[in-house]
């Protein structure tokens, strides 16, 4: 059976586009007695990015630690902290960081509208209720988490994603400027993550023309970045991450 693919519905790409986040939130998430939840990798807690967050006085900012892979217990903790913050659910959840930070944001947005523990939903299409409107903003390229329909979590018994159409971000902002400060070593490893995703996809059992087209383009971009020293490498690596994520989706 051919599946009906759910994709990110709105994509903003370009250097400096992060500064348009406030406009998007004003349109989608702002209202009387409403707040927005920001889940941001704690590596940015003392960085200039902190001052660029379009926070309002009623919003909740939580710095997330991703030194270890995201755990279901941590997702449940962040979900409860958000519920305790206000009598209402947030109008939006914003995930800013690498793949783990974005996975946490996706998982929390789901658990705010679904009962129980996030461990209950590890598997395929177990989520019953749509997530809170959520936005993903990658600050490093390679994982493809910004476009995937899964959020990979370590549970009490297994490491497995919450795989659901409701997991997919409603909006992503792909701003290559956010990756400029990434250390060369880390940039290489996440870039190779993208490259390996594409190799896996192109040799997969269920390969079709759709996945092949994205995988081949992502591989081409990865090679341009790593072999040619392209001056637009940040832009190309961000797009390789997007295409690679689409290929394995």
Positions of predicted regions on the chain:
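Acidic-aromatic/histidine active-site loop/patch
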Residues: 99
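Active-site segments that bind and position negatively charged phosphate/pyrophosphate groups
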Residues: 201-249
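Catalytic cores of large soluble enzymes that bind and process phosphate-bearing ligands
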Residues: 13-14, 70, 183, 187, ...
């Amino acid at each position: 059976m051919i599946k009906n693919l759910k994709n990110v519905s709105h994509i903003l790409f370009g250097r400096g586009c992060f500064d348009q986040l406030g406009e998007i939130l004003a349109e989608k998430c702002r209202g009387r007695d409403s707040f927005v939840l920001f889940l941001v990798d704690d590596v940015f807690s003392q960085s200039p990015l902190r001052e660029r967050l379009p926070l309002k006085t009623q919003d909740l900012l939580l710095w997330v630690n991703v030194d270890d892979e995201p755990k279901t217990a941590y997702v449940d903790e962040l979900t409860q902290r958000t519920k305790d913050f206000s009598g209402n659910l947030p109008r939006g959840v914003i995930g800013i960081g690498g793949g783990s930070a974005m996975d946490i944001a996706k998982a929390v947005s789901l658990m705010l509208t679904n009962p129980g523990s996030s461990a209950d939903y590890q598997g395929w299409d177990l989520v019953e209720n749509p997530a809170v409107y959520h936005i993903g903003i990658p600050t490093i390229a390679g994982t493809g988490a910004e476009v995937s329909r899964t959020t990979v979590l370590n549970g009490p018994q297994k490491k497995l994603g919450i795989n659901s159409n409701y997991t997919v971000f409603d909006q992503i902002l792909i701003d290559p400027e956010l990756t400029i400060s990434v250390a060369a070593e880390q940039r290489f490893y996440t870039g190779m993550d993208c490259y390996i995703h594409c190799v896996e996809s192109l040799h997969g059992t269920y390969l079709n023309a759709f996945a092949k087209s994205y995988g081949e383009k992502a591989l081409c971009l990865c090679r341009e970045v790593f072999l040619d020293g392209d001056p637009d490498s940040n832009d190309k690596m961000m797009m390789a991450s997007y295409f690679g994520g689409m290929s394995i989706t």
